[in-house]
Amino acid sequence: GPSGCGKTTLINLLSGLLKPTSGDIAFANYIYSELNEVEIDNLRFSNFGFIFQKLHLIGHLNAKQNIQIASNNKNSLNVENLIQTLGLKAIENKMVKNLSFGESQRVAVARCLVNSPKVIFADEPTSGLDDSNAKIVIDLILKQAKKTESSLIVSTHDQRIKNFFSDVLEM
């Protein structure tokens, strides 16, 4: 859908980052309104991965540390596998403030996928990427979702990626 139609708000509601003003949201037998903030945070950390429109990388950490900080197992082979798969090996020790946008985007994707989430929420994951990098990012997200049997919820106005998905809801 177009900018401003509520795509990000919908993702934030479904993931428990925002509380609905009416109605309720449930995931895996948990009703969000019955959970306290700590329980919602634990539900998110244990089940959800996020690729935010604004990447929210930690500027005083390097690329690898930004991925590791999200990992529930700091020595995980998954960190190394994602670094390799996403072509981040050459920049893993580079401070994120010195990365290009495409490199930063790939670090954010790796951070999202490091815990093999049950649900991947991707808010404009190809924003600012050229065709080649957009395809790499979408291919990786789809491959990881299939590998881990994750559900994938993508909000975008990028028409280039619409055909990658079997179910599309237009807003």
What are these regions (language model features)?
Residues 15:
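Helix-to-loop junction immediately C-terminal to a conserved catalytic motif
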Residues 23-31:
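Conserved ABC transporter NBD signature motif
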Residues 31, 76-91:
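Conserved ABC ATPase "signature" region
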Residues 32-49:
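ABC ATPase NBD coupling module
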Residues 95-105:
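Conserved ABC ATPase signature
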Residues 116:
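Conserved catalytic motifs of ABC-family nucleotide-binding domains
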Residues 120-123:
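Catalytic Walker B motif of ABC-type/P-loop ATPase nucleotide-binding domains
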